[in-house]
């Protein structure tokens, strides 16, 4: 539901997976088949999609020969989810992120809803792959996958806390601009996001650090942070500074990350020893890539960790 940055990237990503159990059979987007097919095929950030994308008729597109129905309704209760026997709705509009909103998909006949953003309200459980996904209950009809930044932050925070014990900390998130900002100065509920995205570093709020407590409850009240939106279209970076209980040094911390990346967090966490920049992490599948050269320790108990992530893909 919604075929914007997240919806289109989800479909692109799915097409690269072999033997996936998922099949996209419907898209709800106000743009219709012409917009859906064109924006899926041509992408300013990712380049041309290496797939055969065609308009079949006024209500269908095809991707590599597989037909996908395209509908356009702003009211989820009017969507044909029951008729189409939809198992899972990927809720990617950023609008229906609370129980009353997301439940409209269930009312329309879908079995489950995955919200691709932080949920509003404590009644919707949040799961982050590699952190607490094992707690998932099949009885949950509506779940949240948290934000891109929480998916970056939580895996390596989990390692830090398990190995060294986090006392408290703050995060600065240097984040690429998003569609929620203005291209040129214009009205916005956030006066800073009202300013031209491609011309400014824009300080703004982020709930990502606090949201870590939703998947790692013992860290409730221990983390906070801010975001700086910068003039890049994709890939972001987290700079976390924490006080830890156990005395340590940079190499020991990096080794803990490497051990986790090779073991329990394989495919979720990675460690880079190379001097890379943001564009090098575009379309990186993992949730978080530690930049080992930037790990610092002051006084044996103040730790700085920097991690990259593709905020549209990881």
UniProtKB/Swiss-Prot annotation:
| Top-level enzyme category | oxidoreductase
Active-site residue numbers = 148
Keyword vocabulary terms for this entry: Calvin cycle, Chloroplast, Disulfide bond, NADP, Oxidoreductase, Plastid
Question: Where is it located?
Answer: Plastid, Chloroplast
The record, for InterPro entries, names: GlycerAld/Erythrose_P_DH, GlycerAld_3-P_DH_AS, GlycerAld_3-P_DH_cat, GlycerAld_3-P_DH_NAD(P)-bd, Glyceraldehyde-3-P_DH_1, NAD(P)-bd_dom_sf
Q: Which residues bind D-glyceraldehyde 3-phosphate?
A: 147-149, 178, 193, 206-207, 229
Q: Which family does it belong to?
A: Belongs to the glyceraldehyde-3-phosphate dehydrogenase family.
- What protein name applies here? Glyceraldehyde-3-phosphate dehydrogenase A, chloroplastic
Source gene?
GapA
